[in-house]
Amino acid sequence: MNRRPFHFVSITDRELMQKLSDLHPYAKMLPQADWAILVCGDESVSGPFYMDDCAAATQNILLAAHSLGVGAVWCGVDHTERQQSFGELLGLPEHIKAYSLIVLGMPAEEKKTLDRVEPDKIHENRW
């Protein structure tokens, strides 16, 4: 179908970044970041399936950031008061739902890449 229900809010305003950080317990690094992107979904376009498209869009942004040497953190925006608070703060229309907050910036330090391959979770043809 390729309905593309996602929208993006680019956030660079320091005061706004602080307010968002206050609303999200896992985004405390936000006030020190260079930039953030709020990934949102249009529920009127694809109902609850907007979440799948927003997850793919979020992952693509993370991969692009990594390829450019930019640090990025995916902070989920759950479907409770936090989603409503983000919507009110950023003026989102009722049918637009905050999905994820991506915090971006140049890394302060280089970290070793972890090997997270778990062979016991890979199955071929059958379980």
Predicted regions and their residues:
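Acidic, surface-exposed loops and disordered segments
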Residues: 1-127
